[in-house]
Amino acid sequence: QQGNIIMPTKAKADASTNVLQIQPLKQGRVKLRMMGSTPLYFNSMSSKAMRDLLIGGGKKTAAQKQHIKHNPEKEFNDSVYKKPHGETLLCFPAPGVKGAMATAALETEGIKKASVQRLIFLPQTHVQIWGKPQLKIDIVRSSDMNRTPDMRTRAYLPRWCAEVDIAYVQPTLSAHAIVSLLTNAGAIVGIGDFRQEKGRGSFGTFQVLSEDSMGSFQKDWDELMLEDRDVQQEALDNPEFADEQTAELMQYMQEERSRRDITLVA
């Protein structure tokens, strides 16, 4: 008390009220099957392209310029992602599948792309891919100003399937939400080159299934399970051509190699 004025007293803070109660997020997990609806183009960067990025491509000598520009067999092998062990030799980067789901969120009501990137996690680094690769040569346009035409050789899977393990944050997301999001990704985005997302192509699209909901797809799934590591390795070592145009181009390539007396070294 000061004079006739009564000074208010300060209440002591209760230490217990300052303790934050933080509950850990719960995580759900679901394993789903991806059954290819359209063929898959692999699009791994070649080892030569990676070396050129690492140390620079450099200018070609006159002798180097005499060599044939493309080596389709090597480009075919370089175009795939490979696993050192596992049921399959071929695989696809898990971030590519997650990216497809994030892109699909742009067209999916109730979820944002940023939320998918934060709340969904794929434990594996690569997703196993079943299916027999074929060698395919296509005409493409370079990214230079003149859009110069070039030829690109890639692994092409007419039929394919995959199995993906997806973890997600609960209760923000549910297993049903993950299935819906991956289904949308399979329909409007796809994976690999010339995928649906890019507009021009419609490749790499897929349907989403689970082990207990295969229905009429079970027969196709069982057949594709036989196209595993051994079959894929044989297909890379002794490639089959995907179409008549590729077969004609490869025949011309062999004739040109013979004319120039070029022998490929394995």
Regions found by a protein language model. Give the residues of each.
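RNA-interacting cores
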Residues: 2-266
